[in-house]
A protein has these predicted regions:
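C-terminal all-alpha effector/ligand-binding and dimerization domain
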Residues: 172-241, 255, 415-457
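Ordered, small/hydrophobic-rich secondary-structure cores
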Residues: 1-20, 26, 87-189
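N-terminal helix-turn-helix
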Residues: 17, 22-70, 258-309
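Short, cationic-aromatic polyanion-contact patches
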Residues: 4-13, 32, 66-83, 247, ...
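Conserved amphipathic alpha-helical segments that form helical-bundle/coiled-coil interaction surfaces
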Residues: 118-168, 204-212, 356-414
Length: 457
């Protein structure tokens, strides 16, 4: 179980939205702490931190030994105003979000269901038969938890929070869900999982998701008036939540510039002062960032000479990454988790992207990859493809998700030269085998036939 203050803030926001939509009303009891721990895959300390903040802000009352009780009240007019503001900001983005998460999260769902045993399916069957929309959330949480990838769980909850799910079954006599249809779709999904049939799982989940999204959009379009003056709220994947990693994000930008940007043909980085000017940060922040890169083994600070770039060098330096540093281990965990998400989703995302790119964009990408082959820098082709998709995809949410995954995945690239020295425990503790890093589907985004067609067109 994770103990994460940033996730506590997500849980806080999750319940605030639930209160405003009257999913939980005045006098209702919240689920017990152990239930919430299982639902969010976090420790009791994280849940208690979220509940403490809800109590301090007057949303709930807590009494030792009893479930928290809802104190929040609002008038019907306040509910209507909140719903109009909430959905008017998101209406245009909802189809994009559903399509994007279908491409990224659904492959993980398929993999999870194929790993389940009969005991797991018994749990899912019990959840599927419950009419409460909250149990549908627990249904999909239980599935995703099977792959033990905190990053996909984070993405699931962030997208759920953006959509305001789950909604109450009814609002003012208007039914949002057909629970009979939903239960039938979930039973079909369980049957496909029992059969270990990835294609059936994919289609069953897609049918459920499209039913729900159609019902939600139909309700919004029928009940929420258009607000032309309200700007669309973009989906932002808050991987770090309220714990901004300034040096971490800056280190990712430096690694990007070494592989794909201004520093790719340099032996030494520019001075701290020049780097600070380029990235718009203080010199002290830049020094701390280089310190992180030194600990990673990506760079080496040499007195009187500057900061040497090691990540592209094949020569022996006597320097190895310090994987005992908590920040480095955390970022390596993000690398492994993003690696899995990219490996499982890249085929579908790339197929969609190639179909929607303009002729000029397809030519630009082809020329980029041909250039890497000619100058023998083909090892960065996957990263350049991910970056290209993050910049040019027609789906805003894919731009956001792949932009974040690209950055997190960069943490692993400087490790290539140290792969033999990487301790096995950092892999095993995240559910991977050491050979996983050298046999990734990310390096075969397209089949040979697809690649040939791409370059011929």
């Amino acid at each position: 179980m994770r103990n994460d203050e940033g996730f506590a803030n997500l849980i806080y926001e999750y319940f605030v939205v639930r209160f405003h939509f009257q999913y939980y009303k005045y006098g209702d009891s919240l689920p017990k702490i152990d239930t919430l721990c299982r639902q969010f895959s976090v420790s009791s300390l994280t849940i208690k931190s979220a509940l403490k903040r809800l109590q301090e802000d007057g949303y709930i009352h807590r009494c030792h030994g009893r479930s928290a009780q809802v104190l929040f009240r609002q008038s019907d007019r306040e509910l209507d105003d909140y719903a109009v503001r909430f959905f008017s900001k998101r209406r245009a983005m909802i189809p994009d979000l559903y399509q994007s998460t279908e491409l990224v999260v659904l492959p993980m769902m398929v993999k999870s269901l194929c790993q389940m045993d009969e005991q797991d399916f018994a749990v899912l069957t019990r959840l599927a038969e419950q009419p409460d929309p909250e149990d549908q959330m627990r249904f999909f949480c239980y599935i995703l938890q099977k792959v033990q990838n905190p990053l996909v769980m984070n993405l699931f909850w962030e997208s759920t929070l953006y959509l305001g799910l789950p909604f109450p079954m009814e609002n003012k006599g208007h039914r949002l869900y057909d629970d009979g249809t939903s239960q039938r779709r979930l039973r079909e999904l369980i049957a496909a999982g029992r059969a270990k049939n990835p294609a059936r799982i994919y289609e069953a989940h897609l049918a459920f998701q499209r039913d729900v999204s159609k019902q939600i959009l139909s309700y919004i379009n029928a009940r929420i008036p258009e607000q032309p003056d309200i700007e669309t709220l973009p989906f932002v994947w808050k991987v770090y939540r309220d714990r901004p990693e300034i040096c971490g994000n800056l280190a990712i930008r430096v690694i990007h510039d070494v592989y794909l940007g201004d520093f790719r043909d340099m032996e030494f980085l520019p001075s701290y002062e020049k780097l600070a000017g380029k990235y718009g940060v203080s010199v002290s922040t830049m020094r701390r960032t280089i310190g992180v890169l030194n600990q990673l083994g990506a760079t080496q600070s040499i007195n009187g000479k500057g900061t040497r770039i090691l990540m592209l060098s094949d020569s022996e330096t006597g320097q190895t990454p310090d994987l005992t540093v908590p920040k480095i281990r955390r970022n390596m965990a993000y690398y492994l988790q993003s690696f899995e998400l990219l490996a499982d989703s890249c085929k579908g995302v790339m197929r969609m992207a190639l179909q929607t790119f303009s002729d000029a964009q397809r030519t630009e990408l082809a020329d980029l990859l041909k250039g890497y082959l000619q100058n023998k820098r083909y090892y960065i082709s996957p990263q350049s493809i991910f970056a290209f998709v993050a910049e040019h995809s027609l789906l805003q949410v894919i731009q956001e998700i792949y932009g974040k995954l690209y950055g997190l995945n960069l943490w692993g690239y400087p490790m290539a030269k140290y792969r033999k020295e990487m301790p096995k425990d950092i892999l095993v503790e995240h559910g991977y085998e050491p050979e996983d890093l050298s046999s990734s589907p990310s390096f075969s985004l397209l089949s040979t036939e697809e690649a040939a067609r791409f370059f011929q067109e």
